[in-house]
Amino acid sequence: MRLASPRSLFVIAFLGSALLIAIALYMEHVMGLAPCPLCIVQRICVIGFGLVCLVAAIHGPAKVGRRVYAAIAALFVAAGAATAIRQIWLQSVPADQLPSCLPSLEYMMEALPFQEIARLVLHGTAECAEVSWTMLGMSIPEWSLLGFIGMAIVCLWQLLRRD
């Protein structure tokens, strides 16, 4: 049974990622929840996934191209899921063992090399460990991880489907 064409599945994945970013922006600008560094990395991964899916949907590639797009999208999913898992772990660490807060991104961009900025941001901060919102008992990074699992299913479906 054929559920969805490869192109329509890429469109659905793009729309799903656009919805996730819209929710993140709503939470930031309407609910007043400022994103931490790990949240920003997760947003970048969702945007990257969405852009790959959009390009794939516009291009409408054959079997090999579809798998290449799915593999590239899977890289964004893996990075985002790893970041969400890191943030979930930080939320379980006792407060006295959390990393200290970071200086502003503007300052770091002026004063530090890119590799050091990336290391500091991916390490996380006490700000990343704060649970500021929950729904159904799940925090934002847990919901984010659930979204990345859904994206991973799309990638696997596109990688493994037979024509």
From Swiss-Prot:
Q: What is its main location?
A: membrane
Please indicate if the UniProt record lists Transport as a keyword.
yes
- Which one GO biological process term can you cite for this protein? protein folding
Q: Which sequence ranges form a coiled-coil region, renumbered to this chain?
A: none
Q: Where are the transmembrane segments?
A: 10-26, 45-61, 68-85, 143-161
**Superkingdom of the source species:** Bacteria
Q: How does it sit in the membrane?
A: Multi-pass membrane protein
**What GO molecular functions are on record for this protein?**
electron transfer activity; protein-disulfide reductase activity
Task: List the subcellular locations.
Answer: Cell inner membrane
Membrane-side (Periplasmic) residue stretches: 27-44, 86-142
Q: What are the UniProt keywords, alphabetically? A: Cell inner membrane, Cell membrane, Chaperone, Disulfide bond, Electron transport, Membrane, Oxidoreductase, Redox-active center, Transmembrane, Transmembrane helix, Transport
Residue numbers on the Cytoplasmic membrane side: 1-9, 62-67, 162-163
Per its UniProt record, what InterPro entries does this chain match? DiS_bond_form_DsbB/BdbC, Disulphide_bond_form_DsbB, DsbB, DsbB-like_sf
Q: Which GO terms describe its cellular component?
A: plasma membrane
Disulfides per UniProt? C36-C39, C101-C128
Which Pfam family is one of those matched by this entry?
DsbB
- Asked whether the UniProt record includes Cell inner membrane among its keywords, one would answer yes
> What functional role does this protein have?
Required for disulfide bond formation in some periplasmic proteins. Acts by oxidizing the DsbA protein.
**HAMAP family assigned:** DsbB
Family, as annotated = Belongs to the DsbB family.
- Protein name from the UniProt record: Disulfide bond formation protein B
Q: Which source organism does the UniProt entry give? A: Stutzerimonas stutzeri (strain A1501) (Pseudomonas stutzeri)
